[in-house]
């Protein structure tokens, strides 16, 4: 598989080496999909049932933090169903005609995957409702008094929507998904299997303890685990004999400024800012964003979820508060209040 990808990359300079590697290590079947056991077992049943009835799979909404494999799961569903998948994202679909063009080109039981579906415009969303429910498009032709509505029948299809913000979806859209799956942060042992599988796909020499070291610092996120693996590979090839042991992985990750808890520079910057500038909180999100020079959405969607899940940060009605665990991690005395 990777050799074919390398040939494609050689012919097309727009392909980056990182993209080629991503495609090579991405699982194609549910059997290769590590972790998320509840999602995998449910999807196996739903897919088999749809195949037995020779129907399109019910519309599927996948939500969870970034990097947990929403796009990967959508492609796996397409492979398991044996159908084509067309991929787009919410911000790209600016007009109703953009969505109509995609829908009218679908074949029976095909999949339309919309990433960041919470960012669909209301106009485009209105077109989706009859398409999802009745497999019909309602299109307005002409303008003013001469305008008329025509209905276009669509083949049965599956819409897969992915979002990091399920709460931002409108109720009418959310209610039209027959299957809703939430992806959780991965356990360390599941990430270790993912790292080891990726290393095998890339023909890397990697010890199990080396894979464990990478997995422990990957913030429960496969995308981060695979990114760290590529950088550890670089370090091992330049500074050693290419074999990735626990010691080599530790040195490489320390060089990358990723600590034993998986915190990177921005994680530490956020926690330290709350502790040192705001006496541990509570402090509002706007103040944190100004203090660390980061966007609100990035803090809320990318940085905070893992810190909260690990018990280092709390969201309260009055603002963000760091926990005692954060003070212990940094060796800082908690101020008396």
From Swiss-Prot:
<comment type="similarity">
    <text>Belongs to the RuvB family.</text>
</comment>
<feature type="binding site">
    <location>
        <position position="25"/>
    </location>
    <ligand>
        <name>ATP</name>
    </ligand>
</feature>
<keyword id="KW-0233">DNA recombination</keyword>
<dbReference type="InterPro" id="IPR003593">
    <property type="entry name" value="AAA+_ATPase"/>
</dbReference>
<dbReference type="Pfam" id="PF05496">
    <property type="entry name" value="RuvB_N"/>
</dbReference>
<dbReference type="InterPro" id="IPR027417">
    <property type="entry name" value="P-loop_NTPase"/>
</dbReference>
<dbReference type="GO" id="GO:0009378">
    <property type="term" value="F:four-way junction helicase activity"/>
</dbReference>
<feature type="binding site">
    <location>
        <position position="71"/>
    </location>
    <ligand>
        <name>ATP</name>
    </ligand>
</feature>
<dbReference type="GO" id="GO:0048476">
    <property type="term" value="C:Holliday junction resolvase complex"/>
</dbReference>
<feature type="binding site">
    <location>
        <position position="26"/>
    </location>
    <ligand>
        <name>ATP</name>
    </ligand>
</feature>
<dbReference type="Pfam" id="PF17864">
    <property type="entry name" value="AAA_lid_4"/>
</dbReference>
<feature type="binding site">
    <location>
        <position position="70"/>
    </location>
    <ligand>
        <name>ATP</name>
    </ligand>
</feature>
<feature type="binding site">
    <location>
        <position position="71"/>
    </location>
    <ligand>
        <name>Mg(2+)</name>
    </ligand>
</feature>
<dbReference type="InterPro" id="IPR041445">
    <property type="entry name" value="AAA_lid_4"/>
</dbReference>
<dbReference type="InterPro" id="IPR036390">
    <property type="entry name" value="WH_DNA-bd_sf"/>
</dbReference>
<dbReference type="Pfam" id="PF05491">
    <property type="entry name" value="RuvB_C"/>
</dbReference>
<dbReference type="GO" id="GO:0016887">
    <property type="term" value="F:ATP hydrolysis activity"/>
</dbReference>
<dbReference type="InterPro" id="IPR008823">
    <property type="entry name" value="RuvB_C"/>
</dbReference>
<comment type="function">
    <text>The RuvA-RuvB-RuvC complex processes Holliday junction (HJ) DNA during genetic recombination and DNA repair, while the RuvA-RuvB complex plays an important role in the rescue of blocked DNA replication forks via replication fork reversal (RFR). RuvA specifically binds to HJ cruciform DNA, conferring on it an open structure. The RuvB hexamer acts as an ATP-dependent pump, pulling dsDNA into and through the RuvAB complex. RuvB forms 2 homohexamers on either side of HJ DNA bound by 1 or 2 RuvA tetramers; 4 subunits per hexamer contact DNA at a time.</text>
</comment>
<dbReference type="GO" id="GO:0000400">
    <property type="term" value="F:four-way junction DNA binding"/>
</dbReference>
<keyword id="KW-0227">DNA damage</keyword>
<dbReference type="GO" id="GO:0005524">
    <property type="term" value="F:ATP binding"/>
</dbReference>
<keyword id="KW-0234">DNA repair</keyword>
<dbReference type="InterPro" id="IPR004605">
    <property type="entry name" value="DNA_helicase_Holl-junc_RuvB"/>
</dbReference>
<keyword id="KW-0547">Nucleotide-binding</keyword>
<feature type="region of interest" description="Head domain (RuvB-H)">
    <location>
        <begin position="260"/>
        <end position="337"/>
    </location>
</feature>
<feature type="binding site">
    <location>
        <begin position="133"/>
        <end position="135"/>
    </location>
    <ligand>
        <name>ATP</name>
    </ligand>
</feature>
<comment type="subunit">
    <text>Homohexamer. Forms an RuvA(8)-RuvB(12)-Holliday junction (HJ) complex. HJ DNA is sandwiched between 2 RuvA tetramers; dsDNA enters through RuvA and exits via RuvB. An RuvB hexamer assembles on each DNA strand where it exits the tetramer. Each RuvB hexamer is contacted by two RuvA subunits (via domain III) on 2 adjacent RuvB subunits; this complex drives branch migration. In the full resolvosome a probable DNA-RuvA(4)-RuvB(12)-RuvC(2) complex forms which resolves the HJ.</text>
</comment>
<feature type="binding site">
    <location>
        <position position="296"/>
    </location>
    <ligand>
        <name>DNA</name>
    </ligand>
</feature>
<feature type="binding site">
    <location>
        <position position="320"/>
    </location>
    <ligand>
        <name>DNA</name>
    </ligand>
</feature>
<dbReference type="GO" id="GO:0005737">
    <property type="term" value="C:cytoplasm"/>
</dbReference>
<dbReference type="InterPro" id="IPR036388">
    <property type="entry name" value="WH-like_DNA-bd_sf"/>
</dbReference>
<feature type="binding site">
    <location>
        <position position="67"/>
    </location>
    <ligand>
        <name>ATP</name>
    </ligand>
</feature>
<protein>
    <recommendedName>
        <fullName>Holliday junction branch migration complex subunit RuvB</fullName>
        <ecNumber>3.6.4.-</ecNumber>
    </recommendedName>
</protein>
<dbReference type="InterPro" id="IPR008824">
    <property type="entry name" value="RuvB-like_N"/>
</dbReference>
<feature type="binding site">
    <location>
        <position position="176"/>
    </location>
    <ligand>
        <name>ATP</name>
    </ligand>
</feature>
<keyword id="KW-0378">Hydrolase</keyword>
<keyword id="KW-0963">Cytoplasm</keyword>
<feature type="binding site">
    <location>
        <position position="72"/>
    </location>
    <ligand>
        <name>ATP</name>
    </ligand>
</feature>
<keyword id="KW-0238">DNA-binding</keyword>
<feature type="region of interest" description="Large ATPase domain (RuvB-L)">
    <location>
        <begin position="4"/>
        <end position="186"/>
    </location>
</feature>
<feature type="region of interest" description="Small ATPAse domain (RuvB-S)">
    <location>
        <begin position="187"/>
        <end position="257"/>
    </location>
</feature>
């Amino acid at each position: 598989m990777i050799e074919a990808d390398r040939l494609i990359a050689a012919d097309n300079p727009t392909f980056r080496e990182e993209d080629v590697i991503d495609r090579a290590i991405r699982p194609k079947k549910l059997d290769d999909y590590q972790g998320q056991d509840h999602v995998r077992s449910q999807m196996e049943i739903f897919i088999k049932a749809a195949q037995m009835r020779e129907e399109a799979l019910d519309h599927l909404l996948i939500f969870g933090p970034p990097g947990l494999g929403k796009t990967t799961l959508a492609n796996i569903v397409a492979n398991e169903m044996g159908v084509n998948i067309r991929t787009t994202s919410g911000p790209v679909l600016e007009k109703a005609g953009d969505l109509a063009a995609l829908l009218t080109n679908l074949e029976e039981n095909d999949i339309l995957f919309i990433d960041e579906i919470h960012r669909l415009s209301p106009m485009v969303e209105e077109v989706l409702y009859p398409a999802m429910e009745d497999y019909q498009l309602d299109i307005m032709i002409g303008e003013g008094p001469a305008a008329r509505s025509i209905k276009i029948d669509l083949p049965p299809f599956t819409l897969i929507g992915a979002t990091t913000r399920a709460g931002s979806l409108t109720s009418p859209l959310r209610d039209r998904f027959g299957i809703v799956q939430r992806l959780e942060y991965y356990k360390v042992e599941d990430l270790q299997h993912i790292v080891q599988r990726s290393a095998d796909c890339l023909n890397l020499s990697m010890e199990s303890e080396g894979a464990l070291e990478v997995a422990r610092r990957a913030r429960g996120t496969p995308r981060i685990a695979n990114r760290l693996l590529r950088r550890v590979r670089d370090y091992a090839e330049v500074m050693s004999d290419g074999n990735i042991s626990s010691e080599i992985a530790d040195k490489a990750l320390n060089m990358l400024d990723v600590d034993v808890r998986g915190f990177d520079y921005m994680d530490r910057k956020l926690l330290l800012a709350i502790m040192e500038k705001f006496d541990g909180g509570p402090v509002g999100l706007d103040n944190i964003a100004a203090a660390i020079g980061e966007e609100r959405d990035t803090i809320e969607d990318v940085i905070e979820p893992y810190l909260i899940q690990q018990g280092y940060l709390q969201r309260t009605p009055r603002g963000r508060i760091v926990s005692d665990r954060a003070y212990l991690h940094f060796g800082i005395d908690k101020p008396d209040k």
